[in-house]
Amino acid sequence: VLQANEIKAAPYHAGLDSAKRSQTQDDFLMERIDVIVATIAFGMGIDKPDVRFVIHYDIPKSLEGYYQETGRAGRDGGEGICIAFYARKDLRKLEKFMENKPVAEQDIGRQLLQETAAYAESSVCRRKMLLHYFGEEYSEENCHNCDNCLHPTTKIEAKDALLVVLQAVAAVKENFRCLLYTSPSP
């Protein structure tokens, strides 16, 4: 899709032979290509200071991993933007990979995933959360840099409205049809 839109991109993953991976890495470092679509293995050992974007298509397995991977962006002091796409099904998929591991390892893996999911779903300053996770404190309430600080979510109390909806569903014994009608704009 990227190449079809004239973006110079290349894949990088374990399924490629080492010569192809090496060529892709060199092309990226020498700026012959602009985008690498890669597994997490690509970022390890790459020291390219002017990376501007790190995009996760799946949720990372841990906050340590996320921090390491997103740390590739903006190393030169320029802007670095990190985007993580995340859905609950990602957690279920990662939990499934842990099923045949020893129980203690499963417990640790689940804890790491829960911490990563909490980070992804939180409305708290991301810098504050990461620093706290790594044992440091950040006294400011707003870093003026992360998505939560730049675009705070408005919170509303919806308990009463939700109770009305649940009572309505119970009243029709969950056997209903829904018709949505939106009147045309004048």
Label every PLM stretch briefly.
Residues 159-176:
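Positively charged, polyanion-binding regions of nucleic-acid-associated proteins
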Residues 65, 108-111, 125, 160-164:
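Generic recognition of stable, solvent-exposed alpha-helical segments in well-folded globular domains
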Residues 125-162:
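Cys/His-rich short segments
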Residues 50, 93-97, 112-116, 129, ...:
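A general alpha-helix detector
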Residues 91-123:
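A conserved SF2-helicase RecA2
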Residues 1-100:
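Helicase motor core with emphasis on the C-terminal RecA-like subdomain
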Residues 59, 75, 84-87, 106-109, ...:
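Generic alpha-helical segment signature
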Residues 181-186:
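Conserved small/polar residues in nucleotide/adenosyl-binding loops
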